[in-house]
């Protein structure tokens, strides 16, 4: 799975509000944050005092050298040595404090990232299915990878850099004023020029940074989709089409990234140029003052160093501005995700039904539903299913078969009417308790990276190895499992491509058998395997459905001849219902569907 790249910056829609919410989130890390800020300030103060102390040694050296040349004295190396040792101690303390604040901020930022990833993972389980059906996998993954990583890296760097930059500017300004107010005024003249140039660059680069963020999501989604379906792409020889689509998106990403990085990269040369102008001005004026005896050589050396240190925070603040924007934009996207409306996980306590009462009886009473208010999929659906019955739902694509399953498991709620289990509305059950009553075997089998034993045990996590093996035998999966290298301990890869499609379905059937649910949903479970494998799967299915209410959705009508009830759907409504023989004798829509399949085979 591709790892989305880290973005540089994007402007948040609500910068202040997002930062306020981020600070509230970090409130339980207040102590390490304050401690890190204090150590950052102390480190900066000791670092700022360095040039002023060094100036004493420089002045002593210059004065002693002149005195030696005139024959009136010598260089006081003892005094210079004491000053340099004191200076060394200051810089060692500054480095120690800087190390401590870096260690604290790294730990703090990673803990914040850890908390966000945990909250996002928990949030995913509470989001409705509709959220994921409207978004690409890459977009959801980018919240956990790209956005959280950007947030962590920006948080780690921006806060301490902001504190040290502001402290440096204030401290350096105080030191410069203590040396020469007039030279300080000259040095400050570079500020308006620097700020104006920075604002111009930021203004022009911002739109390209935003385009870069948006285009990266498109590229991530395309790469993820192509990787997941690379077999289909190759089978249809669509490599050129996919490559053209990717190149188009990649070109847009390149253009926006190149322009944003180029404009951002202009800041440093511009600031260096302006800073050098300041050096020249200070050097000229300082030389005049030194010639007049109003300032010492050491103070000139210290002042020039302070001018350099004064322009560095300005450069850093421009970088901090980008990092803060990047952090706010990433945090805003994370908070938008965390603030998404959730499914109501629990039912009203006054009406809450006990899941133990689910005995397999299902009643659809005048159900009406549409994914959007202006488009109704199911118009008026009524049906009663008795415990243990096998119910087949058939109909053309788009008739509403899969939608019925989603309503039954409360992935969506009905717009009108009701669905009841043993007389209790499905909305009276906690969602988790309701879904525990259902077992599913889908055409798109889902197996995770792990052993075969672990994949089957997913149906009931507390099952023993013996129970797992018994479920595999009941699903006709035990034989092929024993022939695999490593048997039940064989490791499946990420997409389970080291077992066949039929074997995947047998494993999912074994998992469902182990779960021992009262109601089963079998959605197109045998439509993508060969006839012999289908017979094995069908045998396992029959064994699975014994004594359980089962809803079978299949286009192969030959597989549901023995169903107790067949519901024929067209345009969201049940147009016919009955057994296979009854529907054939009626000569209606079901008979047309059934006969058309055999006509296709003959042709």
Segments predicted by a language model, with ranges:
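Helix-loop-helix
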Residues: 64, 175-189, 259-333, 337-338
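Juxtamembrane helix-loop junctions of ABC transporter transmembrane domains
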Residues: 8-15, 38-39, 46-62, 66, ...
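An intracellular "coupling" helix at the cytosolic face of ABC transporter transmembrane type-1 domains
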Residues: 28-30, 129-130, 148-155, 159, ...
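ABC-type nucleotide-binding domain
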Residues: 355-603
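Hydrophobic alpha-helical transmembrane bundles that constitute the permease/transmembrane domains
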Residues: 41-49, 91-99, 151-154, 158-170, ...
């Amino acid at each position: 799975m591709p790892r989305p790249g880290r973005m540089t910056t994007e402007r948040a829609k609500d910068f202040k509000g997002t930062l306020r919410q981020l600070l509230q989130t970090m409130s339980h890390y207040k102590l390490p944050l304050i401690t890190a800020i204090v150590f950052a300030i102390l480190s900066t103060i000791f670092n700022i005092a360095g040039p002023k102390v060094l100036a004493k040694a420089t002045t002593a050296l210059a004065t002693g050298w002149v005195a030696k040349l005139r024959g009136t004295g010598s260089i006081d190396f003892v005094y210079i040595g004491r000053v340099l040792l004191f200076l060394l101690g200051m810089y060692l303390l500054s480095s120690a404090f800087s190390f401590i604040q870096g260690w604290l901020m790294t730990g703090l930022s990673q803990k914040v990232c850890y908390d966000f990833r945990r909250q996002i993972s928990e949030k995913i389980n509470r989001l409705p299915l509709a959220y994921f059906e409207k978004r690409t996998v890459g977009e959801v993954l980018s919240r956990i990878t790209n956005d959280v990583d950007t947030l962590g890296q920006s948080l780690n760097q921006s806060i301490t850099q902001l504190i040290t930059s502001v402290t440096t500017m204030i401290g350096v300004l105080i030191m410069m004023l203590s040396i020469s107010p007039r030279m300080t005024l000259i040095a400050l003249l570079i500020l308006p020029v620097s700020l104006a140039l920075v604002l111009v660059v930021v203004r022009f680069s911002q739109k390209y940074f935003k385009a870069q963020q948006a285009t990266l999501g498109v590229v991530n989604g395309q790469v993820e989709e192509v990787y997941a379906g690379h077999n289909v792409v190759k089978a249809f020889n669509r490599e050129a089409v996919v490559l053209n689509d990717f190149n188009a998106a990649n070109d847009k990403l390149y253009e926006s990234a190149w322009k944003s990085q180029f404009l951002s990269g202009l800041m440093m040369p511009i600031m260096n140029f302006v800073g050098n102008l300041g050096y020249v001005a200070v050097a000229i004026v300082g030389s005049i003052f030194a010639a007049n005896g109003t300032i010492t050589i050491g103070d000139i050396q210290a002042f020039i160093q302070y001018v350099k240190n004064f322009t560095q925070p300005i450069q850093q603040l421009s970088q901090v501005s980008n990092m803060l924007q990047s952090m706010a934009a990433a945090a805003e996207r994370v908070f938008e995700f965390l603030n998404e409306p959730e499914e109501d996980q629990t039912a009203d306590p006054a009406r809450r039904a006990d899941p133990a009462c689910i005995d397999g009886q299902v009643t659809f009473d005048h159900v009406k539903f549409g994914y959007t208010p202006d488009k109704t999929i199911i118009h008026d659906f009524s049906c009663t299913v008795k415990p243990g019955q096998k119910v087949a739902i058939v109909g053309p694509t788009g008739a509403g078969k899969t939608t019925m399953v989603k309503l039954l498991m409360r992935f969506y709620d009905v717009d009108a009417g009701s669905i009841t289990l043993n007389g209790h509305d499905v909305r009276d059950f906690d969602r988790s308790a309701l879904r525990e009553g259902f077992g599913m075997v889908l055409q798109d089998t889902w197996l995770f990276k792990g052993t075969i034993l672990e994949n089957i045990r997913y149906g009931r996590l507390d099952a023993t190895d013996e129970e797992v093996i018994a479920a595999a035998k009941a699903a006709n999966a035990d034989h092929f499992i024993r022939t695999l290298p490593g048997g039940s301990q064989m490791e499946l890869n990420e997409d389970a491509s080291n077992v066949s499609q039929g074997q995947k379905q047998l494993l999912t059937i074994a998992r469902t058998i182990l779960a021992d649910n009262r109601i089963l949903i079998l959605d197109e479970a045998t439509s993508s395997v060969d006839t012999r494998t289908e017979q094995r799967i069908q045998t396992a299915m029959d064994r699975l459905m014994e004594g359980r209410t089962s809803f079978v959705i299949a286009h192969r009508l030959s597989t549901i001849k023995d169903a107790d009830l067949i519901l024929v759907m067209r345009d969201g409504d049940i147009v016919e219902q009955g057994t296979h023989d009854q529907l054939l004798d009626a000569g209606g829509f079901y008979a047309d569907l059934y006969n058309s399949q055999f006509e296709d085979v003959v042709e």
